[in-house]
From Swiss-Prot:
Broad EC category: ligase
Family: Belongs to the class-II aminoacyl-tRNA synthetase family.
Ligand binding (Mg(2+) 1): 408, 415
InterPro entries reported in the protein's UniProt record: Aa-tRNA-synt_II, aa-tRNA-synth_II, aa-tRNA-synth_II/BPL/LPL, Lys-tRNA-ligase_II, Lys-tRNA-ligase_II_bac/euk, Lys-tRNA-ligase_II_N, Lys-tRNA-synth_II_C, NA-bd_OB-fold
NCBIfam families per the UniProt record, alphabetical: lysS_bact, PRK00484.1
Protein name: Lysine--tRNA ligase
Predominant localisation class: cytoplasm
Protein source organism: Bacillus cereus (strain G9842)
Reactions it catalyzes: tRNA(Lys) + L-lysine + ATP = L-lysyl-tRNA(Lys) + AMP + diphosphate
Length: 499
């Protein structure tokens, strides 16, 4: 369809509708019934690919396969086609004297994109291609629209995202990406289950938007007549479960943030959050690197991966670097000595770091990191020791309370995980929330809201706890070498299509 004008498309649609009418006139259902398959395309290759032409002729192996016609050629009394299923393609050979007049006519009038069922015998052609010689040809579904660009794939990236079903039909690479995504999540679950974690489900609609600094989507509950927020994080409900005695919990689920769309951001995305009682952020660092390495080994067979121009080594142990040391290393600015906000602003001016007038020292430190360091972190690196001002839910560091026991994981200059030793002091937590409310009053609409119910839960006593959040979409991007988050989301957010 990329290279097809409207007139050509309309002609093809009319021809296919006419074929649909003819099928019904012949008593053939163009949207057929159940078809029992014995094999997939990959089964055929793995089971019979090693046999010679002569061995296959001798064995007379009968199979039943189904899929979409992707190529078709031949005239007269015989023809070839390639049939595609989830796993790949296989060639079929159809002869009139084998399948009979009616079924051969079905084959000759079939279009690219039609879904068919084939019964037949496995053989190899003279050039050695594994194929199926049809003894039966069944039309399962008539395709009323032509496939794009003669099955070579969608050239228009926007169309790939809008019509993912066409992308999946025409791009084996795209299908493999989403199969790999499923395997990544399965291995993540398996790793945590094997390590004693309990998978739970918590609400997606919250009375208070909490657990992260982000703008929420709002909705209205008619029966209760109350405003609700689509969750921006899973965190606070999971920590309530830690209070309740569920000592190791995780949830994989959708999170919603009313923010921009980019190659790294989608308004709804998938996260895993996990919490472990009696652990701290050092334990969570070890868990993170071991889990990601495990997933890479199980799904890809290696911990050395290619992402763009970079070869990334995921084998533990990963680099650990304090945020202040990272800033000093990459910019020369030194924030170890306590300083006033005026001194921090002057330092920002000297180093051409853009800041806002309302920022405190901790915010300025974070701006230094984001503007001077982040894009240089290619190999897996744990950046720890975030300022308390930007970490309202993390525990203060015992040795230097300006900073917190928090880390973020960076790979290929992107944040992939956020974790900390959880703040379990309800008095300190209330003070942090109050400081966040002041930020909201100054115009920071991403600052945390007050959550009295969560503070009440902490007052019953939450054990020392380590917590982790990983963006699954970004992890899938990394492990599939995908340049955009849209490449790993089946149906990414899109603007309304212009007529």
């Amino acid at each position: 369809m990329d290279n097809m004008n409207h007139e050509e498309l309309n002609d093809q649609l009319l021809v296919r509708r006419e074929k649909l009418h003819n099928l019904r006139e012949q008593g053939i259902d163009p949207f057929g019934k159940r078809f029992e398959r014995t094999n997939s395309t990959t089964d055929l290759v793995s089971l019979y690919g090693e046999f010679s032409k002569e061995e296959l002729e001798e064995k007379e192996i009968t199979v039943s396969i189904a899929g979409r016609i992707m190529t078709k050629r031949g005239k007269g009394k015989a023809g070839f086609a390639h049939i595609q299923d989830l796993h790949g393609q296989v060639q079929i050979y159809v002869r009139k004297d084998t399948v009979g007049d009616e079924e051969y006519e079905l084959f000759t009038t079939a279009d690219l994109g039609d879904l068919v069922g084939i019964e037949g015998k496995v053989f190899k052609t003279n050039v050695g291609e594994l194929s199926v010689k049809a003894t039966g040809f069944t039309l399962l579904t008539k395709s009323l629209r032509p496939l794009p660009d003669k099955y070579h794939g969608l050239k228009d990236v926007e169309q790939r995202y809008r019509q993912r079903y066409l992308d999946l039909i025409t791009s084996m690479e795209s299908r493999e990406t989403f199969v790999t995504r499923s395997k990544i999540i399965r291995e993540m679950r398996r790793y945590l289950d094997d390590n004693g974690y309990l998978e739970v489900e918590t609400p997606m609609m919250h009375a208070i938007a909490g657990g992260a600094s982000a703008r929420p989507f709002t909705t209205h509950h008619n029966a209760l007549d109350m405003e609700l927020y689509m969750r921006i994080a899973i965190e606070l409900h999971l920590k309530r479960l830690i209070v309740g005695g569920l000592e190791k919990v995780y949830e994989i689920g959708r999170v919603f943030r009313n923010e921009g769309v980019s190659t790294r951001h989608n308004p709804e995305f998938t996260m895993i959050e996990l919490y472990e009682a009696y652990a701290d952020y050092n334990d969570i660092m070890k868990l993170t690197e071991n889990m990601v390495a495990h997933i890479a080994k199980k799904v890809l067979g290696t911990t050395t991966i290619q992402y763009g121009d970079y070869e990334i080594n995921l084998e533990p142990e990963w680099t650990r670097l304090h945020m202040v040391d990272a800033i000093k290393q990459h910019s020369g600015a030194d924030f170890w000595n306590p300083m006033s906000v005026e001194e921090a602003r002057e330092l920002a001016k000297e180093h051409n770091v853009e800041i806002k007038d309302t920022m405190e020292v901790g915010h300025i430190i974070n701006e230094f990191f984001e503007q001077k360091v982040e894009d240089k972190l290619i190999q897996p690196t744990f950046i720890y020791g975030h300022p308390v001002e930007i970490s309202p839910l993390a525990k203060k560091n015992d040795e230097d309370p300006r900073f917190t026991d928090r880390f973020e994981l960076f790979i290929v200059a992107r944040e992939h995980a956020n974790a900390f030793t959880e703040l379990n002091d309800p008095i300190d937590q209330k003070e942090r929330f109050e400081a966040q409310l002041k930020e909201r009053e100054q115009g920071n609409d991403e600052a945390h809201m007050m959550d009295d119910d969560y503070i009440e839960a902490l007052e019953y006593g939450m054990p020392p706890t380590g917590g982790l959040g990983i963006g699954i979409d970004r992890l899938v991007m990394l492990l599939t070498n995908a340049p955009s988050i849209r490449d790993v989301l089946l149906f990414p957010a899109m603007r309304h299509k212009q007529d």
